C-alpha cells in the first residue's frame, strides 16, 4: 500500500505517516469510495461449474433412461446416508463405553479360548450422590463459640501481692 495515498486513517489524522499534499477534491473522492457499500463476493453455489481443460475433454455422459435416471444417484445417496448413520452409532457406542468404563484404565484385555480377545470390564468405583447426602450440617458451617470452662476452684487467688 502506498503511504502517500490518502486513506480514512490519513484523513482523520491518526496515521503514522505524514500527510501528503493531496487536493481537497481528491480526498472527497477517496472518502466517497470508502463510503460505498462493498460488493458481495460470489458464492460457490452461485458460480457456474468449472469447464474441463481443453486437452482432457471427456465424452458426454450417456443419455438418461426413461425413468429419469435418478435411481442410481438415489441409491448412492442412500448408501452414503446409511454409512453415515452407522458411523454415528459407532461413535455413540464408543462414547457410552468410555463413559461406563472410565477411559482405558478400567479395562483389561485377556486372551481366551480360540485366540479371541475379550475385554473383562473391571468397573471403577464411581460414587453417586443424592441431595440427602448433603442434608446434614457441617461442623465448619456454624460459628463455634468457645465454651467457658468452670474452674474447679472458683475462688482461688493466684496473685502474689500482699
From Swiss-Prot:
One of its GO terms (cellular component) is nucleus. InterPro entries: NPR1/NH1-interacting. It is found in: Nucleus. It holds the Pfam family NPR1_interact. Residues 7-24 have a biased composition (Polar residues). Binds to and represses NPR1/NH1-mediated transcriptional activation of LG2 in vitro. Belongs to the NPR1-interactor family. This is NRR repressor homolog 3. It comes from Oryza sativa subsp. japonica.
Amino acid at each position: 500500500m502506498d503511504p502517500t495515498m490518502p486513506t480514512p486513517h490519513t484523513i482523520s489524522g491518526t496515521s503514522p505517516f505524514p500527510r501528503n499534499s493531496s487536493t481537497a477534491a481528491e480526498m472527497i473522492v477517496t472518502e466517497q469510495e470508502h463510503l460505498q457499500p462493498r460488493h458481495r463476493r460470489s458464492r460457490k453455489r452461485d458460480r457456474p461449474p468449472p469447464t474441463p481443460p481443453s486437452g482432457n475433454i471427456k465424452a458426454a455422459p450417456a443419455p438418461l433412461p426413461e425413468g429419469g435416471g435418478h435411481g442410481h444417484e438415489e441409491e448412492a445417496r442412500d448408501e452414503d446416508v446409511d454409512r453415515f448413520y452407522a458411523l454415528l452409532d459407532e461413535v455413540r457406542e464408543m462414547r457410552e463405553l468410555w463413559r461406563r468404563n472410565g477411559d482405558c484404565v478400567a479395562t483389561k484385555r485377556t486372551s481366551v479360548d480360540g485366540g479371541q480377545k475379550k475385554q473383562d470390564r473391571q468397573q471403577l468405583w464411581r460414587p453417586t450422590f443424592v441431595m440427602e447426602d448433603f442434608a446434614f450440617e457441617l461442623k465448619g458451617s456454624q460459628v463455634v463459640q468457645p465454651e467457658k470452662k468452670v474452674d474447679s476452684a472458683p475462688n482461688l487467688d493466684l496473685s502474689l501481692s500482699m
